[in-house]
A protein has these predicted regions:
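Accessory cap/linker subdomain of secreted extracellular hydrolases
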Residues: 1-94, 108-112, 124
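C-terminal catalytic histidine-bearing segment of alpha/beta-hydrolase fold enzymes
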Residues: 52, 67, 82, 100-178
């Protein structure tokens, strides 16, 4: 639906539709060369077309979805929840205690529902249980929300790494910024 809102304010007010963002990308460059969000997704997660350029998930002029590209992206890992569900027996053991997500509950690009689905899956894991965390910015926190400064986030990450570092692994130098 080209007139669907693609970007909104944290209060839920429309900022830009799919059509508007698609037109902006077309004006910035054709054949996946705008260097904007949609073209980046297509180049990163989509297949290469016969012409050597990334195939588009949807036609930026008409909004028509290319189902082959959608299937390719899902099967190749663009859908993180699907990838984790499909591969949990193999990759789950190496991810235990390592997945910690921060997100606003009113993401500008409608990503919060996908995060809720990811959390539902991870909370259902067994053998092994994922052992991570989800923190939501509420009420009405948008894209890029985090509950701390970047410096505080780095300190939290350093403490986590130090806590789980292999026995005897030196961590003092990098924790103190040397």
């Amino acid at each position: 639906a080209p007139e669907r809102t693609m970007q909104m304010t944290p209060e839920g007010q429309p900022m830009a539709t799919m059509r508007q963002i698609s037109q902006m990308e077309l004006a910035s460059g054709t054949r996946g060369r705008s260097a904007a969000q949609i073209d980046v997704w297509n180049a990163t997660y989509g297949p290469v077309g016969a012409d050597g350029y990334p195939r588009q998930l949807w036609d930026l002029r008409t909004g028509v979805i290319d189902r082959e590209v959608a299937t390719y992206m899902r099967e190749k890992g663009y859908d993180l929840r699907h990838y984790l569900e499909t591969n949990w027996p193999r990759i789950g053991p190496s991810l235990v205690g390592k997945l910690h997500l921060l997100t606003g509950d009113m993401d500008d690009f409608h990503l919060a529902p996908a995060v809720y689905l990811l959390e539902d899956f991870l909370e259902s894991t067994k053998a092994p249980y994922y052992g991570g965390s989800f923190r939501y910015g509420r009420p009405m926190k948008g894209h890029g929300w985090q509950p701390m400064t970047n410096a505080d986030l780095l300190r939290e990450m350093a403490a986590h790494i130090a806590r789980y570092a292999p026995a005897g692994e030196p961590t003092r130098d990098w924790r103190e910024g040397r």
